[in-house]
């Protein structure tokens, strides 16, 4: 997004504004208006050091989003899509490599632009014309599809499984899911310090859960399990078509990789909240690679553990509760074994806390610049210096996605819908990085450098993930009870909706209203951020 760096007008500003402008640099953002509420006024955003995130907190913020429902739930869909133990494991390794490629791209952008907002800032830096178009597309994807529905639903399924009721994605599981996201939103909005403390604790906890699964898997390989040896590693790379798995073709491999990417999602989480990170350049460059590297190793070993204890047909049909089936097959059906899925549910809760924390900050960043209708409300930090309004927006979308699908299997569909548009956004981000690296007039510099082969590999992977889901799968047009084309069409539709929103926002509404809003963002010497909103008539010189 091209930004006007001329000083804001002093029209309507008093002595306080003049003193403010003497102390700070300003960044004027000419924005259309949506309603008649906004007057010349200011909002201030300030966080003391106790609220800022250090290296440990940033690492756990990444871990909490990465280690969530994915590794405990998606291995079922991965194997069902490929029909091969060896290929499934290779896809998990490939997913880890692609994650490191994406991390490198985001480190280069994030260390050069250490502000909250993630991809919003990177797209704005590259795609400056038409003005605001890239931002509007990202806004549509982040607000409408940046939900915590899959994580919350998995929490509900594991709670029910632990209680002895193995129920599909029906209304009981969805009701518990709504309670889960409601708790997360209220905690972050009303007790923000405790929200950070809890997801730090759960970050440690879920690492131990994964380590416990890995160690239990080695025990299962040694013969310590309650079922006969499933022999899953015999001729591991054979492509099979069995009861509920294999034979899906290129479409199946694309959706399998999408679900693996979903499981690795979270490596970019700290980029969303860099404005609340201590010494962001140092913190991000240390916390992100350590968290991603450790998680990748644990993911591959956890999948080996699952294959050591779960027969192929049972794994393919286990859907969300893969880890629950694993515990039952290794430890039996005792009350103690049934309690183990509760620990996975708590891990899922940590993921919901991390996702809602980060996505609410992105929503708030969009609102701070006047990009949302009624932006002043969504940007508010009332009442406890936390983005309760933006958290509420995240809650609304999450609940809608939870209750919208018909009763029955919904988890895989929600995962695909959440992950797919990100392939387009990430593709544009990495393509933009390649462009500004080689366009000398861009004067691009960053403390981190991503080499061209890494960028090209990441770009090609995202093109594959964006295009192949439109190819009909082998053996039928329905996947998990939904037509195969639903999630890619909905995903692309949401991105196109961002273009429609851009046209309304930049062209239609200013003409109808006759004026626009100018949002001037200021950063004080003490780190406080002040945003002043002013009405400006269309065609009026500032």
What are these regions (language model features)?
Residues 1-82, 99, 510-542:
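Membrane-interface "cap" regions at the ends of multi-pass membrane proteins
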Residues 12, 20, 25, 46-49, ...:
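Helix-loop-helix junctions that connect adjacent transmembrane segments
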Residues 39-40, 45, 49-154, 261, ...:
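Transmembrane helix-boundary motif of multi-pass solute transporters/channels
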Residues 100-181, 185-186, 348-362, 410, ...:
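Hydrophobic transmembrane alpha-helices that form the core helical bundles
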Residues 115, 139-153, 264-277, 335-374, ...:
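Membrane-helix boundary/coupling elements in multi-pass transport proteins
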Residues 118-130, 161, 240, 292-353, ...:
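TM-loop-TM module centered on a large, flexible mid-protein loop between adjacent transmembrane helices
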Residues 173-233, 265, 288-292, 415-426, ...:
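Membrane-interface loop-to-helix entry segments
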Residues 376-388, 426-492, 512:
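C-terminal membrane-solvent junction of multi-pass transporters and transport-like membrane proteins
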């Amino acid at each position: 997004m091209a930004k006007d760096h001329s000083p804001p007008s002093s029209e309507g500003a008093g002595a306080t504004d003049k003193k403010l402008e003497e102390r700070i640099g300003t960044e004027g953002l000419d924005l259309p208006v949506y309603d008649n509420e906004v007057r010349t006024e200011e909002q201030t955003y300030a966080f003391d050091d106790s609220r800022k995130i250090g290296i440990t907190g940033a690492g756990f913020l990444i871990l909490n989003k990465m280690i969530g429902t994915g590794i405990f739930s998606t291995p079922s869909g991965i194997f069902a899509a490929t029909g091969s133990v060896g290929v499934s494991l290779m896809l998990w390794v490939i997913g880890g490599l692609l994650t490191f490629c994406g991390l490198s791209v985001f480190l280069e952008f994030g260390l050069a632009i250490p502000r909250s907002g993630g991809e919003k800032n990177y797209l704005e830096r590259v795609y400056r014309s038409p003005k605001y178009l890239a931002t509007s597309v990202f806004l549509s994807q982040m607000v409408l599809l940046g939900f915590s529905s899959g994580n919350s639903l998995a929490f509900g399924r594991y709670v029910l499984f632990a209680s002895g009721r193995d129920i599909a994605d029906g209304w009981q599981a969805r009701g518990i899911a709504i309670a889960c996201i409601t708790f997360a939103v209220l905690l972050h909005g009303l007790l923000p310090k405790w929200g950070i403390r809890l997801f730090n604790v759960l970050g440690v906890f879920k690492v131990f859960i994964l380590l416990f699964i890995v160690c239990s898997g080695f025990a299962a390989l040694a013969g310590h399990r309650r079922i006969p040896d499933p022999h899953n590693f015999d001729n591991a790379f054979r492509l099979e078509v069995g009861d509920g798995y294999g034979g899906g073709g290129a479409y199946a491999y694309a959706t399998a990789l999408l679900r693996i990417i979903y499981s690795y999602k979270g490596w970019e989480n700290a980029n969303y909240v860099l404005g609340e990170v201590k010494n962001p350049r140092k913190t991000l460059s240390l916390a992100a690679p350590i968290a991603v590297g450790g998680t990748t190793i644990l993911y591959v070993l956890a999948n080996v553990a699952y294959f050591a204890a779960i027969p192929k047909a049972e794994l393919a049909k286990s859907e969300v509760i893969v880890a629950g089936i694993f515990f039952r097959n290794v430890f039996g059906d005792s009350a103690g074994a049934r309690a183990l899925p509760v620990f996975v549910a708590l891990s899922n809760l940590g993921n919901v806390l991390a996702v809602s924390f980060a996505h609410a900050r992105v929503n708030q960043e969009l609102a701070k610049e006047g990009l949302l209708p009624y932006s002043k409300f969504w940007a508010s930090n009332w009442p406890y210096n936390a983005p309760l309004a933006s958290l509420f927006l995240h809650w609304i979308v999450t609940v809608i996605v939870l209750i919208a699908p018909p009763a029955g299997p919904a988890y895989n569909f929600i995962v695909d819908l959440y992950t797919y548009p990100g392939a387009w956004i990430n593709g544009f981000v990495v393509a933009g990085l390649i462009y500004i690296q080689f366009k000398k007039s861009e004067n691009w510099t960053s403390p981190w450098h991503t080499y061209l082969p890494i960028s090209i590999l990441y770009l090609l992977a995202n093109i594959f993930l964006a295009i192949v889901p439109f190819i009909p799968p082998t053996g039928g047009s329905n996947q998990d009870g939904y037509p195969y084309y639903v999630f890619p069409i909905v995903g692309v539709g949401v991105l196109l909706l961002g273009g429609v929103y851009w046209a309304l926002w930049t062209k239609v509404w200013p003409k109808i209203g006759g004026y626009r809003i100018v949002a001037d963002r200021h950063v004080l010497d003490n780190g406080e951020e002040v945003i002043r909103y002013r009405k400006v008539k269309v065609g009026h010189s500032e």
